[in-house]
């Protein structure tokens, strides 16, 4: 993987977790340690085109991000085009995991996102090893038992050989303006 300062990061799912993360990554275009400019690119991917239109107009219906914060995220490219994901070095999956009527997690959004990322991995032309990070709230074992097999099937790559994978859940309280990601 190239250094984080110059890699392309794709955030998949621009809801309560993904949008603040994408904005934060995109607004820091200078290394805090050295002051040198960063060459990092951030792709914000969502399948909801209405959501993307609202964000482009400076409106976040979740109220997690202000219009000025959206405007300051100059390195953020919003898209619903999965083909652009093939340009990423790091994939951060932040899709929702709602529960069904029996209070079981519905992994459908996570499975669909994993398949989308897997197809992007297959289309990549970079020699660097891509990293896929799951931040969706799931039960133990989901990454290894559900997500990784989908990534392998869709990409024709093998875990820890063709791509790396990890899990890092975000702990946020939607609507809490005092305790935010940053």
For each of these PLM feature ranges, what is it?
Residues 1-57, 77, 83:
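NAD(P)+-binding Rossmann beta1-loop-alpha1 motif at the extreme N-terminus of oxidoreductases
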Residues 2-4, 70, 157-159, 178-181:
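Solvent-exposed alpha-helices and their adjacent loops that cap or buttress functional pockets
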Residues 6, 39, 88, 127-129, ...:
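A general structural motif
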Residues 32, 37, 62-74, 154-164:
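Short mixed-charge
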Residues 65-90, 99-100, 118, 122-125:
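A structured beta-alpha segment of the ubiquitous adenosine-cofactor-binding alpha/beta core
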Residues 91-93, 134:
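Redox-cofactor binding/interface segments in oxidoreductases and associated redox assembly factors
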Residues 93, 164, 171-182:
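Dinucleotide-binding Rossmann-like beta1-alpha1 core, especially the glycine-rich loop
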Residues 99-171:
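Rossmann-like NAD(P)(H) cofactor-binding subdomain of soluble oxidoreductases
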């Amino acid at each position: 993987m190239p250094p984080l300062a110059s890699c392309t990061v794709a955030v998949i799912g621009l809801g309560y977790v993904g949008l603040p993360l994408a904005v934060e990554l995109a607004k820091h275009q200078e290394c805090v340690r050295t002051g040198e400019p960063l060459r990092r690119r951030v792709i914000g991917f969502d399948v909801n085109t209405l959501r993307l239109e609202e964000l482009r107009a400076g409106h976040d219906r979740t109220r997690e991000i202000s219009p000025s914060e959206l405007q300051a995220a100059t390195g953020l490219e919003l898209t619903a085009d999965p083909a652009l994901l093939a340009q990423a070095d790091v994939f951060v999956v932040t899709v929702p995991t709602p529960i069904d009527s029996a209070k079981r997690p519905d992994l459908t959004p996570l499975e669909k996102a994993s398949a989308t990322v897997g197809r992007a991995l297959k289309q990549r032309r970079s020699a660097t090893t891509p990293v896929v990070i799951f931040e969706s709230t799931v039960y133990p074992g989901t990454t290894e038992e559900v997500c990784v097999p989908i990534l392998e099937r869709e990409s024709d790559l093998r875990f820890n050989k063709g791509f790396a994978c990890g899990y890092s859940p975000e702990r946020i309280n939607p609507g809490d303006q005092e305790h935010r990601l940053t």
